[in-house]
Amino acid sequence: MGVHSDDWIRQMVKKHRMIEPFEESQVRKKVDGSQVISFGLSSYGYDLRVSREFKIFTNVFNSVVDPKAFDPRSFVEMESDCCIIPPNSFALARSVEYFRIPRDVITICLGKSTYARCGIIVNVTPFEPEWEGYATLEISNTTPLPAKVYAEEGLAQVIFIQASEPCSISYAERNGKYMYQKGVTVPRL
């Protein structure tokens, strides 16, 4: 009943493959020595990376963003080492890491301060008990300027919270609609 530490996260990765790929410590530099926005294991969480897959919202077709009838023309898909999000706009992406959440744990995921201090807000819904998949990441540029997000670098921190008791019905048992998601996943009903 509380937030799990780096030791617990490390054990769950070794025993249950909770995070793949897994970085044992905070990575702040590439092999060539250039700096990156940090990712990997931290004291009480795991800093996930954003992949090279992005869906950037666009108004080219004047579509309405409707969660019950999502129009795929609402965004432009791209694969790149970085993503430029237009002013006051939004992009979807996915994590590099694949997660397997234990039955008695729920997560909260918060954007890294490096991006938050630039007006880039990351929203990720909780990873529910026994959810498994790549995380879809919602990235908002709240500034009046274009904003750059770097692929394969840190974007948000996942905090693992122990429940007081296991849930009676897990996300997997409910056949959750985002179970085993692979790519950037748009709204489903």
Curated annotation (Swiss-Prot):
Oligomeric and partner information: Homotrimer.
BP GO annotations: dUMP biosynthetic process; dUTP biosynthetic process; nucleobase-containing small molecule interconversion
Gene3D superfamilies (alphabetical): 2.70.40.10
Known role: Catalyzes the deamination of dCTP to dUTP.
One annotated GO molecular function: nucleotide binding
Active site annotation, chain numbering: 138 (proton donor/acceptor)
Pathway membership, UniProt: Pyrimidine metabolism; dUMP biosynthesis; dUMP from dCTP (dUTP route): step 1/2
Binding positions for dCTP per the UniProt entry: 112-117, 136-138, 157, 171, 181
Keyword flag Hydrolase: yes
Family the entry assigns: Belongs to the dCTP deaminase family.
Lineage: Bacteria, Pseudomonadati, Verrucomicrobiota, Methylacidiphilae, Methylacidiphilales
Protein name per its UniProtKB record: dCTP deaminase
Catalytic reactions on record: dCTP + H2O + H(+) = dUTP + NH4(+)
Enzyme nomenclature, EC number: 3.5.4.13
